[in-house]
Amino acid sequence: MKIRTVMSVFTVLLCMCVMPLCAQEAYNNFLKFKIDLYNAESKEAIQSHIEAYRKKIEASNLNEEEKLTLFTLLAVEQTDMAGKANAKQNYRLLTEQDDRCKAFMEGKKDSEVNVWLLVGWADIKSRLAGFSSGQTMYDEALRSRHLYEEALKQDKKFPQGHLSYGLWLFFAPPIAGGGADAALKAFSKAVSYSNTPEEKYLALLYRSQAYIALENPKKAAADLRAAHDLFPKETFTQLVSEGNKNGKLFFE
């Protein structure tokens, strides 16, 4: 009986360890997908990547919260890639995903869910704020900020949290503590806390744009070179560099 009890306890502990690791692997794979998306050669290739990834989420054995998290992150990337030309479709997609998050979060505290979901939902709301005005815009922006802050409260060294919050700060007005300087600090934290090549690549990429906004092209170029060195076959940093020379930031 003692051996059976020990084995039962061991099995429970193993499950507790494996499940978060499986989820973390899924989130790491999302970043790989995101980089592939950035480096896709055409709109058709982007759409193909998105559909393949959507099917991958649907077929996975992740739980409800983890699947919702990945679909939320995917919705953000899909609308970002679609651009302003697809504004109506983007608004519909963002609103639908926001509703799914609200339904899942009903009766739950923000502190009860994983940091990736908090950041993904915050990204959804920050983009919805761009479709709003007046009090609605203020409410969406404020709620997104609280979600970012809750995620970073749970994990102060969460690279994606600092990255997304940095982007929020970049577009936020100075009265809300925003601006390129504030964004640079957040992006720099994302660089410092990166644990994988994918995390560092994205953090360097975003930080380079803050440097451009602050008229420091040398540091921007250094970040883009460092990002490229992580994935020598990638081509996106070259496109970003060319855009910067023409006064364009890749996330604007």
Go through each PLM region and give its residues.
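Canonical positions in the second alpha-helix
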Residues: K56, F104, A151, A190-Y193, ...
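Boundary/linker segments of alpha-helical solenoid repeat arrays
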Residues: N61-E65, M105, P159, S194-K200, ...
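Single-residue signature of alpha-solenoid repeat helices
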Residues: H49, N90, L94-Q97, S144, ...
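Amphipathic alpha-helical repeat scaffolds of TPR domains
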Residues: E25-D36, N61-A85, S111-S132, K157-P173, ...
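Hydrophobic/aromatic packing residues within the alpha-helices of TPR/SEL1-like helical repeat arrays
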Residues: Y53, L94, D98-C101, M105, ...
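Bacterial N-terminal signal peptides
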Residues: S8-V18
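Terminal, low-structured helical/coil segments at or just beyond the last alpha-helical repeat
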Residues: Y201-A203, A210-E252
